[in-house]
A protein has these predicted regions:
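N-terminal alpha/beta PP-like core and its mobile active-site loop of ThDP/TPP-dependent enzymes
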Residues: 1-329, 364, 368-371, 444, ...
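Active-site diphosphate/adenylate-binding microenvironment
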Residues: 4-7, 12, 27-35, 338-412, ...
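Glycine/charged-rich beta-loop-alpha catalytic/anionic-binding loops adjacent to active sites
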Residues: 34-42, 59-66, 389-403, 471-473
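A general structural motif
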Residues: 46, 106-107, 176-188, 248-252, ...
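Phosphate/pyrophosphate-binding active-site segments
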Residues: 132, 285-381, 501-512, 516-546
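Catalytic phosphate/nucleotide-handling subdomain of diverse soluble enzymes
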Residues: 409, 413-450
Length: 546
């Protein structure tokens, strides 16, 4: 068969359902093979958005998301999405085209060494140099992308190789088994937890697997340990649980850090140092048990005292089975901290001033979203408010990036979420800056006939940087911009545009749009003056003597 046919057959064998991308001239043989396959092509308006969609597909399903681009400028547009996937531990395969490698009459036109360009942001990057190697390369790329820690891989398919006749056949897919934990480490962890006075559980993104969610819920029910999570660990355990303290949206000086500072043992499950630190460790403070699929990456703010490496769910199940509550456990202080956190989150959540303040916005979104509804956040200061104040009830219902923390990923991620879960409510929440970085995908969403709501928070500036600029004592400079008429902008794509002009419209507008088919964009003017007042002044003035 033709090499491009073989490539697509290999992807089918691996269970690939969608390919997101923007094909070019060098992909035409591959595109023809794709036309005759069961795999559905999701044509996007920019390769970066295709990569974000594919990475999010990987995050939500555990399967490898696949995206396609041409050579040169198409492949370079993948780069940010590849880094997003690699740092965020989302399985992603990027396929790029290339000019003929055996005989080309176009000189160096559009040619870059894409394989080497991808090396720093991938786990695996290869060029196909003969068609019969395709089954090996595809199988290895998929395996590497999915194995812990998941991430990005890349294969380059040159134009002339795609036309070769091949005799090779796809490999049979073998499901790998994750390594089991060392029982001696499990026993040592049980002893450390039992002998601690104020053990505290931290849940990170690595725990966001179905089996691990169940295991952690059982662990918490049996022990009654209080827990908190990182931003990317939101929803692993239902945050309505009475033992939930909060999310580490800030690295220091939040109410949550009072509990962290008082803990004498932190059981760190699935956290990855690639996330912005949920706390800063110092020598002589609480001991840390690191439970993950891989060994801890030590740095000056994170170092573990015991490591349990292997399948996280199995590790937690073994601990739960043998652990009995410690005689010296005292969670009184944690209970008081939880009360303070809950009060602070509730404060101003009903304050219907205009423009809308973040606390009210978060509260209203939580009110209208169903338990399994998904919010996809872009990057901006509002992400801190949602991470901190929005309670997630189920795994992967708050999609955010706290690793690369790139702008422009929120809306494409929401599109991918709606493709994966067509019957669930999905809400993209973007700042005006982040939305405009990939707003062209409005056309993609409309063309796919999705039912999706986009909340655009308008402050006409790069608000996060503006806040930091003011905090450093600098004058305002270089961060303000204009915006289109978002209602007309949405309508120009065939979507429905809405604008909140007084705060009491927000709840009804959100509910109506979530229940009405089609693509809806809601423009919401926001007041970020609360950033300085609450996240800096109030938290700096608080005391941990509760």
């Amino acid at each position: 068969m033709k090499a491009s046919d073989l490539f697509v057959r290999c992807l089918e064998e691996e269970g690939v359902v969608y390919i997101f991308g923007v094909p070019g001239e060098e992909n035409l043989d591959f595109l023809e093979s794709l036309r005759e396959s069961k795999i559905k092509l999701i044509l996007t308006r920019h390769e970066q958005a295709a990569g974000f969609m594919a990475a999010t597909y990987g995050r939500l399903t555990g399967k490898v998301g696949v995206c396609l681009s041409t050579l040169g400028p198409g492949a370079t547009n993948f780069f940010t999405a590849g880094a997003y996937s690699q740092l965020g531990a989302m399985p992603l395969l990027m396929i790029s085209g290339q000019k003929p490698i055996k005989k080309s009459k176009q000189g160096r036109f559009q040619i870059l060494d894409v394989v080497e360009m991808m090396r720093p942001i991938t786990k695996f990057t290869k060029q196909v140099v003969h068609g019969n190697s395709i089954p090996v390369l595809v199988r290895e790329a998929i395996r590497v992308a999915q194995e812990e820690r998941p991430g990005a891989v890349h294969i380059e398919l040159p134009e002339d190789i795609a036309t070769e006749e091949c005799s090779a056949q796809p490999f049979e897919v073998i499901s790998p088994r994750r390594p089991q934990p060392d029982e001696r480490a499990v026993t040592q962890a049980i002893d450390m937890i039992r002998s601690a006075t104020r053990p505290l559980l931290l849940i990170g993104a690595g725990a966001n697997r179905t089996s691990t969610c169940k295991a952690l819920s059982m662990f918490i029910e049996k022990t009654g340990l209080y827990f908190f999570n990182t931003q990317m660990g939101k929803g692993v355990v239902d945050e309505r649980h009475p033992c939930f303290l909060g999310t580490a949206a800030l690295s220091t000086k939040d109410y949550l850090h009072c509990a962290i500072d008082r803990a004498d043992l932190i059981i760190n499950v699935g956290h990855d140092v690639i996330e912005k630190p949920p706390f800063y460790m110092e020598q002589g403070t609480a001991k840390v048990i690191h439970v993950n699929h891989f060994f801890a990456q030590m740095d000056e703010v994170y170092f573990s005292h015991l490591e349990i490496v292997g399948d996280i769910a199995t590790s937690i199940e073994h601990i739960t089975e043998k652990l009995e509550p410690g005689k010296n456990w005292d969670f009184t202080y944690f209970h008081r901290v939880k009360h303070e956190i809950d009060e602070h989150v509730e404060d101003k959540s009903k304050e219907a001033s205009f423009p809308v303040i973040p606390q009210y916005l978060v509260d209203q979104v939580r009110v209208v979203m169903p338990d399994d509804g998904i919010i996809a956040l872009d990057n901006g200061v509002y992400k801190i408010w949602f991470a901190r104040n929005y309670k997630a009830y189920s795994p992967n219902t708050v999609l955010l990036d706290n690793a690369l923390a790139t702008m422009g990923a929120g809306f494409p991620s929401a599109i991918a979420a709606k493709i994966v879960y067509p019957l669930r409510k999905v809400l993209a929440i973007c700042g005006d800056g982040g939305f405009m970085m990939n707003s062209q995908e409005m056309e993609t969403a409309v063309r796919l006939k999705l039912n999706l709501v986009v909340l655009v928070l308008r402050d006409n500036a790069y608000g996060m940087i503006k806040w930091k600029q003011a905090g450093m004592g600098f004058q305002e400079f270089g961060l303000d911009y204009g915006n289109p008429d978002f209602m007309k902008y949405a309508e120009s794509y065939g979507a429905k545009g809405h604008r909140v002009e007084q705060t009491d419209q927000l709840n009804e507008m959100l509910q109506s749009c979530l229940e009405t088919p089609g693509i809806h964009l809601i423009e919401v003017p926001v007041d970020y003056s609360e950033n300085e007042q609450v996240l800096i002044q109030e938290l700096n003035a608080k005391t941990c003597v509760l």
